[in-house]
Amino acid sequence: MKKYTLFFTFCLLISVFGAYSQDSKAGAIIDAMQKKYKTMKSFGASFTYGVDGSSQVLQGNITVKGSKYRLKTGGQEIFNNGKEVATYIKETNEVNISDYEPSENDLNPAKVYTFDKKGFRYVFVQEVTEGGESYEVIELSPEKKGTQVSKVKIKLNKKDKSVKSWVITDKNGKRQTFKVNKFTPNVAVDDKYFAFDKSKYPGVEVNDLR
């Protein structure tokens, strides 16, 4: 069974982090960002991502509504209807279904924008100007030893605290960069959109892991 790990890499932005003396400016930026996104009932985003050393740039999109989400990227679709998670792999036309078990450390893509900052070591890095817009850059790193992530650097619009991009550096120094191309708040979406519908994938092989 071929495994894909992009979803987990994408969501490692909200892995378990430890507590250190914190940068108050970075903390205030995080608070403002979270206040913005937590007021939304739902949202949709399209993004590009790539790995340092590779010229390949891939595209993806995500729709989130509460704990429900649907992520399309890297030849796969991930559905979470709040009860179960279905990962569809296009190349092999198979879907893996497992129970959704939320926890404090759940790698829910909704938390890319609303992660709990408790336990994070966060610092303000710099302010930069791109295309006439001012952006604030903050960096988060884990206290817990042995995690796959070394640090996460997030770039936010200074004016409205929207996330522009983030860079994940793993323990081996490899970096993945994600850039938000379009963000739509409060999208109208039915709950059925987050459930895998077998009838729409003729001949799909179902691997029930529950």
Region annotations inferred by a language model:
Residues M1-F7:
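Bacterial N-terminal signal peptides that target proteins for export
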Residues F8-V16:
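Bacterial N-terminal signal peptides
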Residues F17-S55, S67-K68, K200, E205-R210:
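N-terminal leader/targeting segments and the immediate start of mature chains
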Residues A45-F47, Y69-T73, V85-Y88, I97, ...:
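Short hydrophobic/aromatic-rich beta-strand segments that constitute the beta-sheet cores
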Residues D52-S55, Q76, G173:
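Solvent-exposed loop/turn segments connecting transmembrane beta-strands
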Residues Q59-L107, Q176:
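An acidic-aromatic
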Residues Y100-S134:
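Flexible, surface-exposed loop/linker segments and immediately adjacent secondary-structure boundaries
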Residues F120-P202, V206-L209:
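Gly/Pro-enriched, hydrophobic low-complexity segments
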